[in-house]
């Protein structure tokens, strides 16, 4: 018999902790959405004072299960147990009251409120007159930060914080509920290497305090560094759980994809043609200066550099999002002035942005609506009318080519996994038949199987004569996919490396100049 959230919260508050082997567990869980079985008889078991990683391709069911454990979704079938007692979680508030907190990949803080106000929202300490006691709230926040070894001013507005510090605030907020379980969804996707190290120190401190942590990630190195054990999901099913010390990287990949991935970077030697894009002394005041390079047909130019080096800003300028202050751009041997994305598209350029959710996908629209955006003004409009049948057929073919996992084209993009959202974006731009393709972090937050598929697509486009500019923070991707590598540091180009001479050390030396 399941215990109500209120009853379980009372048991938790009393300190009467059942003698259970697992802090949190799920057995026989099933969840269906229209046309899709997201979870089918899955299980999960989290031990106290441990880090348990969840691995699997996009759409494997990881996030769905975690949303069930966080009270966001309710399961169609199955049992959830907290410290051995079966519970029912009908809302995120139920989960919080029972000590289960989830830190989402998309952070949910109020930008114009202070750090302290965000942490204690709807739980603010009051003075005798019933007003918020900001002094007490400040001290409570400082005490919490001291416990977590976080150095952030409680009175600063969140909008002034870096992504890493916002994440620290989210963690502190979750801990402030006296949580026994923290669920972290891709917590390092937008962090630098140093910020990741800081996050891991905090995770280890939380683990030492007896907290159990569920860690969703696609990054193998993180699993081996921070996780005690891991579980793998595939196609909505539970595959297995192992100690992270008992397996190799290849073992995990086989469990995730159910097959061998023989070529993660299927780079081909293709004929390099004429110059398609030539940039000379391009500047954007206060951001980057004197950027010069060229890309030829069939060539993949990798762009490497640390966070803040200006790589994404250059991409946005090339695509007309932020017009340059000075410098020149030539397309196909002719000078052009690109002042808007519409003009860039007209010149057969395509740009896959690094932030698919904020500046890429229109989440509330369906797959068809997202894919057709870039082509409706062109070949599918005749006599002022859209040839909707032709549009749908073309988008259907593209979705099949990219292996987008969906029941149909009318599924809202917000319901897709991160990897499938990225495929929808790629499909949108492939429909424009581009001659120049700019990719900014094309495989960020995507599982190993989807990465290999996207690398294959990029290779095919290069083979077809497309000039590719690929910005990536993943060194194996840059080294494995690029014909040449351009390295940037603090808004300037510090050097170029050919494929046969490029090494991780050489790239990092140029990136740190």
Swiss-Prot record:
InterPro entries per UniProt: AAA+_ATPase (IPR003593), ABC_carbohydrate_import_ATPase (IPR050107), ABC_transporter-like_ATP-bd (IPR003439), ABC_transporter-like_CS (IPR017871), P-loop_NTPase (IPR027417)
Name the UniProt record assigns to this protein: Putative ribose/galactose/methyl galactoside import ATP-binding protein
Source organism superkingdom: Bacteria
Native organism: Rhizobium johnstonii (strain DSM 114642 / LMG 32736 / 3841) (Rhizobium leguminosarum bv. viciae)
Main localization of the protein described in the UniProt heading: membrane
This protein's UniProt keywords: ATP-binding, Cell inner membrane, Cell membrane, Membrane, Nucleotide-binding, Repeat, Sugar transport, Translocase, Transport
EC code: 7.5.2.11, 7.5.2.7
Membrane topology (UniProt): Peripheral membrane protein
S-S bridge residues: none
An example molecular function term from Gene Ontology annotations: ABC-type D-ribose transporter activity
Enzyme type, top EC level: translocase
Chain's role: Part of an ABC transporter complex involved in carbohydrate import. Could be involved in ribose, galactose and/or methyl galactoside import. Responsible for energy coupling to the transport system.
Binding site for ATP: 56-63
Subcellular compartments: Cell inner membrane
Gene3D superfamilies, alphabetized: P-loop containing nucleotide triphosphate hydrolases
Catalytically driven reaction(s): D-ribose(out) + ATP + H2O = D-ribose(in) + ADP + phosphate + H(+); D-galactose(out) + ATP + H2O = D-galactose(in) + ADP + phosphate + H(+)
Family designation: Belongs to the ABC transporter superfamily. Carbohydrate importer 2 (CUT2) (TC 3.A.1.2) family.
SMART domains for this protein: AAA (SM00382)
One CC-aspect GO term: plasma membrane
Domain ABC transporter span(s) in chain numbering: 24-260, 270-510
């Amino acid at each position: 018999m399941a215990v109500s959230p209120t009853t379980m919260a009372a048991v938790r508050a009393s300190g009467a902790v059942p003698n259970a082997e697992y802090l949190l567990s799920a057995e026989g869980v099933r969840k269906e959405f229209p046309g899709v079985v997201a979870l089918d008889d899955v299980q999960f078991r989290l031990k106290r004072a441990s880090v348990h990683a969840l691995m699997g391709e996009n759409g494997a069911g990881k996030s769905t299960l975690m949303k069930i454990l966080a009270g966001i979704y309710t399961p169609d079938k199955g049992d959830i147990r907290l410290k051995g007692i079966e519970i029912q979680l009908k809302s995120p508030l139920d989960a919080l009251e029972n000590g289960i907190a989830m830190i989402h990949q998309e952070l949910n803080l109020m930008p114009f409120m202070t750090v302290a106000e965000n942490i204690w929202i709807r739980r603010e300490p009051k003075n005798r007159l019933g007003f918020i006691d900001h002094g007490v709230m400040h001290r409570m926040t400082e005490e919490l930060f001291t416990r977590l070894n976080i150095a952030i001013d409680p009175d600063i507005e969140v909008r002034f914080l870096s992504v890493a510090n916002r994440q620290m605030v989210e963690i502190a907020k979750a801990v402030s509920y006296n949580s026994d379980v923290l669920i972290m969804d891709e917590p390092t996707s937008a962090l630098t290497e140093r910020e990741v190290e800081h996050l891991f120190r905090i995770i280890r401190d939380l683990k030492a305090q007896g907290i159990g942590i569920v860690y969703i990630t696609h990054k193998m190195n993180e699993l081996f560094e921070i996780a005690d054990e891991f579980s793998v999901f595939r196609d909505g099913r539970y595959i297995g759980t192992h100690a992270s010390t008992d397996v190799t990287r290849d073992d995990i990949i086989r469990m995730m994809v159910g097959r061998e991935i023989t070529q993660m970077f299927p780079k081909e030697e293709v004929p390099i043609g004429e110059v398609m894009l030539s940039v000379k002394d391009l500047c954007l005041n206060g951001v980057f200066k004197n950027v010069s390079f060229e890309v030829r047909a069939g060539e993949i130019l990798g762009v490497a550099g640390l966070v803040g080096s200006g790589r994404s800003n250059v991409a946005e300028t090339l695509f007309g999002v932020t017009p340059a202050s000075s410098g020149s751009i030539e397309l196909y041997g002719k000078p052009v002035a690109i002042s808007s994305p519409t003009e860039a598209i007209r010149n057969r350029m395509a740009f896959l942005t690094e932030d698919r959710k904020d500046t890429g996908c229109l989440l509330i629209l369906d797959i068809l609506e997202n894919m057709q955006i870039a082509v409706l003004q062109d070949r599918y409009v005749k006599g002022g009318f859209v040839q909707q049948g032709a549009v749908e057929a073309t988008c259907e073919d593209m979705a099949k080519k990219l292996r987008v996992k969906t029941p149909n084209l009318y599924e809202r993009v917000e319901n897709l996994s991160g990897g499938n959202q990225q495929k929808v974006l790629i499909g949108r731009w492939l429909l424009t038949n581009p001659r120049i393709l700019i990719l900014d972090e094309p495989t960020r937050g995507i599982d190993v199987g989807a990465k290999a598929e996207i690398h294959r697509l990029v290779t095919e486009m290069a083979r077809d004569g497309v000039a590719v500019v690929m910005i990536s923070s993943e060194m194996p991707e840059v080294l494995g996919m690029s014909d040449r590598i351009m390295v940037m540091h603090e808004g300037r180009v510090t050097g170029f490396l050919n494929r046969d001479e490029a090494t991780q050390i050489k790239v990092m030396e140029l990136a740190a100049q």
